[in-house]
Every structure is written in C-alpha cells, then in structure tokens.
Swiss-Prot record:
NCBIfam families: FadB, PRK11730.1. The lineage of its organism: Bacteria, Pseudomonadati, Pseudomonadota, Gammaproteobacteria, Pseudomonadales. The record marks E120, E140 as: Important for catalytic activity. Keywords: Fatty acid metabolism, Isomerase, Lipid degradation, Lipid metabolism, Lyase, Multifunctional enzyme, NAD, Oxidoreductase. It comes from the Bacteria. This is Fatty acid oxidation complex subunit alpha. Involved in the aerobic and anaerobic degradation of long-chain fatty acids via beta-oxidation cycle. Catalyzes the formation of 3-oxoacyl-CoA from enoyl-CoA via L-3-hydroxyacyl-CoA. It can also use D-3-hydroxyacyl-CoA and cis-3-enoyl-CoA as substrate. NAD(+) binds at M325, D344, V401, V402, E403, K408, S430, N454. The active site is at H451 (for 3-hydroxyacyl-coa dehydrogenase activity). Its EC number is 4.2.1.17, 5.1.2.3, 5.3.3.8, 1.1.1.35. Residues 312-715 are annotated as: 3-hydroxyacyl-CoA dehydrogenase. InterPro entries: 3-OHacyl-CoA_DH_CS, 3-OHacyl-CoA_DH_NAD-bd, 3HC_DH_C, 6-PGluconate_DH-like_C_sf, ClpP/crotonase-like_dom_sf, Enoyl-CoA_hyd/isom_CS, Enoyl-CoA_hydra/iso, FA_oxidation_alpha_subunit.
Amino acid sequence: MIYEGKAITVKALESGIVELKFDLKGESVNKFNRLTLNELRQAVDTIKADASIKGVIVSSGKDVFIVGADITEFVDNFKLPDAELVAGNLEANKIFSDFEDLNVPTVAAINGIALGGGLEMCLAADFRVMSATAKIGLPEVKLGIYPGFGGTVRLPRLIGADNAIEWIAAGKENRAEDALKVGAVDAVVAPDKLAEAALNLIKGAISGEFDYKAKRQPKLEKLKLNAIEQMMSFETAKGFVAGQAGPNYPAPVEAIKTIQKAANFGRDKALEVEAAGFVKLAKTSAAQSLIGLFLNDQELKKKAKAYDEIARDVKQAAVLGAGIMGGGIAYQSASKGTPILMKDINEHGIEQGLAEAAKLLVGRVDKGRMTAAKMAEVLNGIRPTLSYGDFGHVDLVVEAVVENPKVKQAVLAEVEAQVKDDTILASNTSTISISLLAKALKRPENFVGMHFFNPVHMMPLVEVIRGEKSSELAVATTVAYAKKMGKNPIVVNDCPGFLVNRVLFPYFGGFAKLVSAGVDFVRIDKVMEKFGWPMGPAYLMDVVGIDTGHHGRDVMAEGFPDRMKDDRRSAIDALYEAKRLGQKNGKGFYAYEADKKGKQKKVADPSVHEVLAPVIYEQREVSDEDIINWMMIALCLETVRCLEDGIVETAAEADMGLVYGIGFPPFRGGALRYIDSIGVAEFVALADKYADLGPLYHPTAKLREMAKNGQSFFG
C-alpha cells in the first residue's frame, strides 16, 4: 500500500500503475468532506513524489463513485468571511489542479453516480471511462450555488460552452450514452468491464498510443471561442436560462456569467473567477434556504427510515372509493410494485378510477418513460371490485371516500369487519380528526390517517396522522408503504387540518380579509406569484375547489374558533353560494376554457365582481408588502403553533411539509426558515403591526421569548 487513509487509499496494481481509490469508512457513499480533501492532498503529494509511478487510475470502493461535497459542512463554511471562503475554495482547487498536473497519465473509472465534486474529480483526470449504467452531473444549482471545484472551468473546455451551460444550468443527471455523445467521457463499457477498460486505457496512455498531454492541454487554456461566438453563445443562454429559472434562482445565470468571464483565461485564473462567483452565491438567501431544504429532506428521510425496524411489509393493498383520487392512489401503488384492490359501490366509480390510472399510464408510455408491456403489468396490479370478497388477504386499506365524517365512519366500520385482525386502516382525509373517526372502530390501534395531496402522482408529500389510539406499528407500516409508493411521508399528530391544511387555511384567511378590504384578487395573485408561490391564492382556491375550500374552512373554524372563525360572509361564501366552484365547473374567481390540447386555461371573468361586491366591506389602501404580510404572517404563525403544540416534531418537518404539500417557495426554505431569514425579533415586531387583523396575527408567548433571547429555529 503506497498510501492509506480513512477515505482514500493508493495501491500498486502492475507495471508502475497505481489505483487511487475513494472508499470513505463508515459511510455508504463517498463524499468530499474535509477529511477526504485532506487525504486527497496527501495522496496526490505521495504520487507526485514517487518516480516509479507511471499512471494513475481513480476508482471507487463503493457502489457509487462520489456523490459530491458533504453538504452538512456548507452551513458553517458559508458563514465564513468572503475572503476566507474564497481562499478555502482556491486551496481545495489547488489539490485538483495538482492532480491534473501530475507528470503521468490519469484515468477515472466511473461507476454508479458521479455528481458535483465527484464529476469535477473526474474532469481533472486525463481520460474518463464510464459504466453503461452510471450517471454523471453537476446538480449544484439545485442548492442555489454552482460547481466550485473547477466544474465551470473544465467542463466547457472539454465539451464546449453550449453543452456545459446546458449541463450546469439544468443540474440534471446525465446517462452514459449522453455523456459519451458530447465528449464528457471517452468510453462507455459494461459495468463488469469497467476495471479492465480503465487498465487498458492507462496502459495505452503510458505506451504513447493515447496522447494524454494533448488530451489535458485544452483544459489548461482559454475557451476556443472568438468574441462573436462568445457573445452569441453566452448572451442567448443567459436570456433563455433567466426566463426558465426566474429571478428568485440566480445560480444558473451566475454560472453562465462565470463561464463567460473566465472564457479568455487559462485554468488557474479561470478558477479564481469561479471562486469569486461561488462565494457570491453562497452568501445569498436562496442558497442558504435551498441548502437548508436539502438538509431537512435528509433528516426527513432518516426519520422515515427509522420506522423500517418495526414496519410490516404491505404486500397487498386496497383503496375504498375509486374515482379520480382512488384511481390516483391505485396507480401510484401498482406502478411502484404493490398490487391493489380498488373498491367502489358502483360501476361508474370503478370506471372513473380505472380511467384515471389508464390516463396516467398512457401519458408515461407516450413520453417514452414506460413500455406498453410495463403499462399492462401495472394495470394488472389494479383489481377493481364492487365487493369485499378478496379483502381477507389485504395488509393495508386506504379509505378515500367523500370528506364527510359520518360516511367515513360507516365505511371504515364496514371494512374493519371484512379484513384480518392486524390489517391497517388508513383514512385519506384532509381535515377530519383521526381520533374522531376511530370511535367507529373496534381496533382503533390499527387506524391512522394517510393524507395524499392532489394530484396524487405529482405531489410528493403524504401526511401520516397518528390518532390518540394509533399504534406505532400502524404508523410505521403506513410510513413504509408511503415510501414504497415513492412518496415523502411526514408523521404528524392529530388535530383539525393536521399540519398542511391547518397552516394553509390561515393563509386563505389572510386572502379573504384582503378581498373584503377591497383588494383585487388578480393583484393579490400577481403579488404572491412574484413572491415565489407557484400560483396565487385565488387561482389555488379555484384549483382546489371552492366547495372543498368552503368545507375545509368550516372544519378549521370549528376546530380553532378563537382565531379561524369569522362571522362575516367572505369571498369563499359568495362564490360557493353562486355555485362558482372553480376549475371543476368552469367558474370560480376566474373562468376556465379548454385550450387546443384540452387543458383548462384560466381567463378573466368580469361577472365575478358582481358576485364579490356584497363581501367587500371597505376600500383600504394596501401596499404589495402589506399583501405579502397579511398572508404570510398568518401562515407562519400557525406553523409556529403547530410546532409548539407538538403536531409536528421538528422545524425541519414543518418546513418540508409546506414545501412538498402546498408549494411553499423552495428558495425561501419554508415558513420557519422564512421567519429566521427576517429574524425572529423582527418578525414578531412585524406581526405586531398587523395585530388589529385578529388573533391569527398575534405571536405566541414562546415566540416572543425566542425573540427576546435572540433564538432562531435553525441555528
């Protein structure tokens, strides 16, 4: 062994060839943390000092190559002063450059995935050979930053500026054949031939068959584009990418600007340009929020994984109530490998459920994401039925009937009598108390809530609701089933609206107050979309359904009358009474028409103002900032209450629930991180300015205490 560390080893293979292997002890994947970087420095120095070494193969001892930097280190690193952060970045880059400058040829053997710093390590090698099943990419823009280990410098010099911009700005993973096509790798081989191919390639480079110095040289020089080509390439890309990313996600455009600024420099000067831009992005609130989201997501997955120890495997599922929701649940279950019975009380419901599943499957086949044979297999995994005949073998039943407590209780009691004693029953309710529904059951310990969001196939969140009598086994099994379905489960405790809807309705409450104060709902939508929401509150209410919103608001008002009950008629009441139910019947706040593709498109409908006139009680001067505050303060304070009440266990889960469940702007990180970004003390002072709007705007005593003590939700 030439070098041995905890993350990297260097050992002799044959004829002066050595293998530099990444294999981080105690971890399932390789990543660039401080330890790995320090050991890479030592390994490179060791190789450089050994004159007997003729070539280096870089490999991984794990199923993946390197997944990138250790994101957990970003939080503290990014708090460093700019100059210190730039110096640290350049010091790390010196390691990669020294590896690139070795007086012997180098080959990277890429298995599994090589992302971020993992791919940047490969780019520093002279040659890259890739397993046919591997994927490579630079996903840093998803964290609000761009590649910082030479990715913006080496990749454009290797595959051309246009291709590099596409890879870096999109941040996606790229398959082996695509990587070979653009020249990011030199060869693609079967996974079991990777080591052999890398060895043959390095031997060819040592013998002079392949000129490694000629291969290396373009990465050390300026970009081969003249001034006109640069202008056309970069200016066009900046305009297009800015339109795609939007103003709240600066990283993709900054990456292009960095490539452009460094285009006329050699490698070392170009790396300085990269470092300066990287640090600039690292200090943005978008980067801090998106990195926080990534870490929250990791925490969420870790918590969900902990339930695996006691969870039972769901081999056969069932859904009660077909229709669009039931069909969506059936599709999701069957497409992820769990066969499911789909029961309804009539043929129409069954037909609707099957049509929904078939529509989703056909869509995947049409886009080339699924074969016709796989589609047939998934459809065979959905068995429609009008009876309980086969329910004796079911492990978990999802009840998805109408949102009415009496109907749900009757259906749940009925199915409980038809299943095994240990079958888990889960209600897909959006607002009704699980403990209330459990009163109809003989085995309430086997009962939980399992709240899917619409449309099921697109929305990543599932709330798993623990009732007063729910067992940990029932909770764990439901969490495991949700994960198996490809969802991100969050366990919450029971209360009206659970987490997501309990927080969403105060947001809608703020919206209703604005309309009643004479603020045009179209203006409100525009302001909130500019703030970062995927759609404004009026449009969202139309999509959800005015009737659904009306019912949900009443449930929430009954559950929290002190702050959510409003005796005045509101815009929701006016539209509901006028039978303007939103997208579902073509008229809500907006009118809806089918476009050429048959997709519902919203259009202005002047007649709605007549409907809303009776619920406008004043004409108040309200700024755009006021609009944001009326809505966001109510939402944020209810999130704080959910955390304080123990409805959700951690700030991370609360924030992820809102990002995954209602599209809270990711670049703002979630409600609690949004409070942190303002400052807890500043947020409390801001809320106090709107105290006249009612109890929804009154900070809790605990939040005031946090403000007084200079505390935050995320350290």
